[in-house]
């Protein structure tokens, strides 16, 4: 799966009334009506012992300059990194992220050693205009503008 490019997010949640987070790249849109998204979480994570049906979680879509936050919330904790949480929407989100999504859990499905958290979007906001942080083949990458060799015309369909 390392040859599939993904965006990088930090999923934020409340644990014992305090802001907490974990890095996740298994985040996706599920439905437009209703607006549903999903995140895949390892069963042994603190998230799964804290967040259940009806609870909220936040998805912070990281900018390419936020590798340090990805590493921090991915388990390589930095004692010197200040986590820039804010709660303008009564929920902890990360300053400097490309976008923020707040989600209410509507379903949880077991999938091997993970749980799939499906949630209805309750809030979306744009954050910092910046290129996204992406991950490919075990490394962070930067997106470059690509000039396609073939032009796609919407009238042609798929």
Predicted regions and their residues:
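Basic, polyanion-binding surface patches
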Residues: 1-158
